[in-house]
Amino acid sequence: MKNVVIVDCIRTPMGRSKNGVFRYTRAEDLSAHLMKGLLKRNPSVDPNDIEDIYWGCVQQTLEQGFNIARNSALLAGLPQSIAATTVNRLCGSSMQALHDASRAIMVGDAEICIIGGVEHMGHVPMNHGVDFHSGLSKSVAKASGMMGLTAEMLGKMHGISREQQDAFALASHQKAHKATIEGYFDSEILPIEGHDENGVLTLVTHDEVIRPETTLEGLAALRPAFDPANGTVTAGSSSALSDGASAMLVMSEEKANELGLPIRAKVRSMAVSGCDPSIMGYGPVPATKKALKRAGLSLDDIELFELNEAFAAQSLPCIKDLGLLDVMDEKVNLNGGAIALGHPLGCSGSRIATTLINNMERTGAKLGVATMCIGLGQGIATVFERP
């Protein structure tokens, strides 16, 4: 089996979904920009040697329909010989894209792949056209398809208070703002044109979604968003709605060495797992444990974790049961997470992996885990190792 390595990883800035910088920019344009960007940043890679593109996207309709991976590749002017497929594991779609490409490379079916994902939640809302089968109600409660209520359930099961959620949300914005000011995101963001609040074309270089003005008092004043009578989850402690894309250049270790490309990280192991849909946010716990077992590692071996923050009420139980509460500030989401940056569904998997790899390089960490929950009860995790 061949070793799989990441030689480059980038993302767009995260744009606010409601009247944000990408309101006139289509999902295919966000995607094509990154595909072209990876090749421009790595001129030693012959595009004709790329086997396949795996691109995550959840709402595959409207501008994101009819295989957005292929549409974006053609829009980017990539060789027509490069195949492309769109991957959907809901929130874990672009991490699944990485897993699919990695397996193809491991068994020799590919040497070089582009992976990534996109979601334009401003143009294609999360619930657009969704029609659940009525028969699901025999085994799954209707509320299991309502992500906010699953977060409420998970938070109550683990005794997570409103105050803990608000503090976690505040920290996400503070860390993301600090990362922006300190330039920690500069190595992963590929600037792209968008439009400012006046509709003027502008170069977007930073995330639009972060709210540095957030305070505990402001968060405490928000009403519960999903369970008005007894809830604790608010818009402020939930992942923001944002638009964005992310991408990675993935290849065999042999090919990277042949091309003289720096190996930024190796895919050490991968895993997915299912869990009760009513507590879908718990998926990272079994997925992470499974991935670590496959890598022959323990939780103590991992120096950095990147956990997608769907909700504070969902993140904190996962952090608790992974034994990370006491080291959360030093090990988990150093640059904040989706509460501050947003969660463009198909983009997030490779986005958090990209942020993890950049943080591993910045801090000198050798081993890291990127993991996320997935709607309707799944989790996905990837263990990365720096050379």
UniProtKB/Swiss-Prot annotation:
Q: What is its EC number?
A: 2.3.1.16
Q: Which reaction does it catalyse?
A: an acyl-CoA + acetyl-CoA = a 3-oxoacyl-CoA + CoA
Pfam families registered for this protein in UniProt: Thiolase_C (PF02803), Thiolase_N (PF00108)
The Gene Ontology CC terms held by the record are: cytoplasm
Q: In which pathway does it act?
A: Lipid metabolism; fatty acid beta-oxidation
Family to which the UniProt record says this protein belongs: Belongs to the thiolase-like superfamily. Thiolase family.
Q: What is this protein called?
A: 3-ketoacyl-CoA thiolase
User: Which organism does this sequence originate in?
Assistant: Aliivibrio fischeri (strain MJ11)
